[in-house]
Every structure is written in structure tokens, then in C-alpha cells.
Amino acid sequence: MSRIFVQIASYRDPELVPTIRDCINKAKHPENLTFGICWQRDDVESLHEFTNDNRFRVIDVLWNQSKGLCWARSLIQKLWKGEEYTLQLDSHHRFIQNWDVELIEMLKQTGSEKPIVGSYAGMYDPVGDRLLNKEPYMMVANHFTLGGTILFFPRAIPGWESLTKPIPARFVSGHFYFTIGKHCEEYKYDPNIYFAGDEISLSIRSFTLGYDLFHPHKTVIWHEYTRKGRVKHWDDFNEKNVQDKLVDMPWYLMDDNSKRRLRHMLQEEDNNIDLGEYGLGTVRTHRDYEVYAGIHFKDRKLHPQTFAGVFPPINDTSNWHLLENDSVQYEFDINIPKTENFKMIYIGVEDISGNVLHRVDLTHYVDVLTLQFESNKKPHKWVYWPVDLNDNWYNRIDTVITNI
């Protein structure tokens, strides 16, 4: 009997119950599943249909007591009871038939004693449960953000139709990974990491703990990416709710503290933070990961093969491509169209090929925004794209940049 501990952190998500149902219904051996759920809920949500199911271990948290994604995931890990395997998810997924057998077989195919298989999952639309793609994704590093994290993009794995086993990876995603159960004990989630940075932390820390990273060679799980129809943590943890004493701290302070910890762990800066048990492992070193993945954190370099998505390992320190070596510091003002009744305004800067060079998510309206960033590619246009209070995107407006 191969038991699987399914970890789900859910925040006010109407897709939680449909995700659980599909996970159970599509498993070949649903009797071997156990669920660890951190259920960060409001007053109208219900898990009543699973109340008497002994496969479920649920941490019940009112939404305003939550401290963020990785805090929830750290609590879930403590619910592990020796299951041979573990699958970590978000709370909005769909599954292939017999997904449990497929993932166990993938781990065996790697030939590794400590494999972790994961990536950005495929895409689905909850309306009609439409699965939007078949091709499996790899995670490709695009650039370092100003906060010190890496922005990743999904890319279809080249030649995936002919692949028969998982491929080596330099990154895995927190919203979908499958590994041996003792990862719950060995990789302790840092509860102080808010949201951004979870993936690079998961990747480098697992690697230094001796885990070998892989992407699945076929699509097994789908994910809902648009966030439409659900409240996000940062929607609730705002200044108004702090003033009304509904929450203790705005999300951006949690995020700032989180990124300082992350930069210290990645050795981008030394800020005297004591990471305790949430630092790197000792089986491999920080430098081992840099050479394997083609990344230099302190100088924020990406190897050209890393940027291109070539399968690792790189093992080449003689031909680094410093994205900022030939970079230019850009600073210019943009006039934001008057916007009312919005939840967020996406402001993006793109080059002539449509690559995102810089991004700002506005949660408060300003009529003039000063953009400051570095890039070795010339900005071509900026994008204004607001989201309304019901999580619907307004029309996107692209404006060619002429003042730089």
C-alpha cells in the first residue's frame, strides 16, 4: 500500500471542495489518500461532506487569523503521519484519471533516491471544468525582481510528445509537486515567507537537502491561474481592515519582511537575520545549486542556457550572462487613466517582443506613477490593465513609450 499525503492550503476559495472531489474521484486508489488542509475560511464556507471522513486532517482558521501562504503550508506539514508520498497543491486544481499511479511511477522513473517532481501545472477553467492545454510545462527564469526573487514563466517542454520519463529541472512549483513523504520533515516551510519567493526557496532548499529536481513529462494536474472569483489574502489584509482592527498587519509589511529573509537565505545580502531551521541544507551547497541551475544570486546573474530554458545541469561558470551587465537604469513617469471601482491595476513595461521588463500592481489609485527599473532591453511600451471588484479584467491599453 502506497499512501499519499495531499497538502492543500486554501484561502477563502470556492474551488476547494471541487478540487478535493476531483482529486478523490480521479485517483485509482482513493482509499490510500489522506488530506492535510489548512482551511482559511469565511463564515459561508463548508467542508461538511468530509466531516466524518477519517482521511481528512483539517486546521480550521478564520480568514483574519491567517498569516500567509507559507505559514499555512508550515502548519500542514505537521499533519504528516508517515505516508510514503506527499503531493502539495493549491486549492484550485483538476486531475488526470489515475493521477496517483502516474505520479508514483514518475518518481520511480527518475532513478533518484530523493526525487521531487513538480512544475507549473496545466491550465483549466472552472466554468465547465475545461482543460485548456495538454502540453506539460517547464519553469523558465525570466529575470530578477527588485525585491530579489526570480520571475518565472511557464513554457511547453520541447519535444514532450516523445518523452517517456521526467526531465531534470532547476525549479519546482509550490502549487504542484510530488515527492517522498519525509520531505514534510526535512523541508520545513518557513512560516515567515509570505507568498513571493516560495518557489525559489522550495527549489534551492530542497536541492541542498539532497533532493533531485524534475519536471513531469506529461500533464497530470491542471491549475486555475486567473484567480477569478476568489478573494486573495492581499485583498483582505489591507490598510482599511487594519484600521478597522479586523487584521493585525497589511500584506505589504508581511511581504517586505518575507523578502528580506529570502534575500538573506539566497545570499543576495547579509542582513543578520537568523533563519534557524529554515535555511539551506547540508547535503549540497548554495554554490552547488548556482552551478547546477546557472544562477548567481548575489550579482543577480542568469546563465544564457538558464534564460533559454535549456535542461540542467549547466556546470559552466565561464560563460555567464549578466542580465544587468549592459543594463540601463530607466526612470520615467506615466499618467494613469482615471479608474474607479477597481481591485488592482496591472502596470507592465514590455520590450518590442512583448517580454515583460518590469511590473507594478497598484492597489491604490495614483494619477502619476514613477517607474524605476534596470534592463538590458529597451522598453517599448507600457501596459495599463485594471481588474474590477469581481476579478474581471477591463480592456488592456498599450501605450508606446516615447519619453526615454
Segments the model singles out, each with a brief description of its role:
Residues 2-281:
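Catalytic cores of eukaryotic secretory-pathway lumenal/extracellular enzymes that build
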